[in-house]
């Protein structure tokens, strides 16, 4: 079986191999985060027929927002990538375990912008939904921003904090970039996706060459690097599997259409290891939700939904996990809700006086 890294790409770079973080980080949550696995040979079950969960099905919501499916039908390169994915169920399963943490948030952000919900699956292709994934070209995070593109979209990068790993910030930056590319290429999402992988300059030059030769200038007719030739069909193929799993002999483990995490505003930095002991949430889970924190959350904290409710009911828990801190020139610590329009709602928890 191919190493997982061979499936993954980076935003605006052409390095196919990734150095993936410790896969054991997902082990405690394997059963609850599995999403795509081979269907039983004697039956094929679609998500709507599985045990009902409050909030409805996120898969059903995603399908309602799919708008690129017409571009997937009868395309040989998409069919090839679909078979390629189906031959690698371990990738689909491992990717989905992590993706279940983030998909509801990403879908919500896409809905706000009226963007195709197939794009919610892009981190599966970019990073396997691993926020710690890093390429040899230094692309980082769920959305695989290289340093220059991260700076272009105001993602902070310093020694103790790299916002390319931050789930909300990197997601919004990625959608900003995709929206820009969509406009740049006159509303063509396939060209926008190709440019997300290869850079708009490379795609623009390929269009210019074809136009000069009297050739078609759509994505399928452009001469692009091999990685980019596979990148867009692979996303479309994955969306086919999600859109019609029964047609392809896979089953989707249920994901409820409800937030997986809640954002909590912090007045002081919090030690994740200490908070894990106090809250009962596994430290690895806190680190996967707060990968930019590097063990110390500042400003805001992402917590699994049920754990955040317990936290709000016991605000002294934050105080016990708080670290002594003096704001430096690069940050300002406040006890105010995040104003970035985050989904789900941000809750404010201030540390008790004297902590």
Locations of regions flagged by a protein language model:
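Short, functionally critical alpha-helical segments immediately adjacent to catalytic or ligand/cofactor-binding
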Residues: 115-131, 192-198, 286-289
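An acidic, Gly/Ser/Thr/Pro-rich helix-cap/linker signature
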Residues: 9-114
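Primarily a LysM-type cell-wall glycan-binding module
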Residues: 253-283, 331-338, 344, 349-355
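Compositionally biased, proline/threonine/alanine/serine-rich low-complexity intrinsically disordered stretches
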Residues: 18-50, 310-355
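Bacterial N-terminal signal peptides
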Residues: 1-9
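Substrate-binding clefts and substrate-entry loops adjacent to catalytic sites
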Residues: 82-94, 129-136, 144-172, 176-187, ...
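Extracellular LysM carbohydrate-binding repeats and other cell-envelope/extracellular binding modules
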Residues: 289-324
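Catalytic and binding regions of secreted/periplasmic enzymes and modules that target cell-wall glycans
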Residues: 179-206, 274
């Amino acid at each position: 079986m191919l190493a997982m890294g061979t499936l993954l790409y980076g935003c605006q770079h052409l390095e196919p191999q990734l150095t993936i973080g410790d896969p054991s980080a997902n082990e405690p949550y394997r059963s609850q985060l599995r999403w795509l696995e081979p269907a039983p040979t004697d039956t094929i079950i679609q998500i709507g027929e599985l045990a009902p969960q409050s909030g409805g099905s996120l898969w059903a919501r995603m399908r309602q927002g799919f708008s690129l499916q017409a571009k997937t039908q009868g395309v040989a390169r998409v069919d090839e990538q679909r078979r390629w994915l189906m031959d690698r169920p371990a990738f689909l399963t491992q990717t989905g375990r992590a993706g279940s943490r983030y998909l509801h948030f990403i879908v919500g952000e896409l809905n706000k912008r009226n963007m195709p919900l197939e794009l919610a699956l892009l981190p599966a292709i970019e990073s396997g939904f691993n926020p710690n994934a890093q390429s040899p070209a230094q692309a980082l995070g769920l959305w695989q921003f290289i340093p220059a593109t991260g700076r272009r979209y105001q993602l902070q990068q310093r020694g103790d904090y790299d916002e390319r790993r931050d789930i909300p910030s990197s997601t919004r930056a990625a959608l900003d970039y995709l929206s820009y590319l969509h406009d740049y290429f006159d509303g063509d999402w396939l060209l926008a996706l190709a440019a997300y992988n290869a850079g708009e300059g490379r795609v623009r030059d390929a269009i210019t060459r074809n136009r000069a030769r009297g050739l078609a200038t759509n994505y399928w007719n452009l001469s692009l690097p091999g990685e980019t030739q596979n990148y867009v069909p692979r996303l479309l193929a994955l969306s086919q599997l999600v859109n019609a799993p029964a047609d392809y002999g896979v089953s989707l483990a249920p994901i409820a259409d409800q937030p997986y995490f809640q954002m909590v505003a912090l007045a002081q930095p919090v030690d994740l290891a200490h908070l894990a002991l106090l809250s009962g949430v596994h430290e690895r889970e806190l680190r996967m939700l707060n990968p930019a924190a590097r063990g110390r959350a500042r400003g805001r904290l992402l917590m699994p939904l049920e754990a955040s409710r317990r936290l709000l009911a016991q605000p002294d828990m934050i105080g016990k996990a708080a670290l002594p801190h003096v704001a430096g020139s690069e940050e300002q610590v406040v006890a105010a809700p995040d104003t970035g329009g985050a989904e789900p709602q941000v809750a404010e928890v201030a540390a008790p006086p004297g902590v």
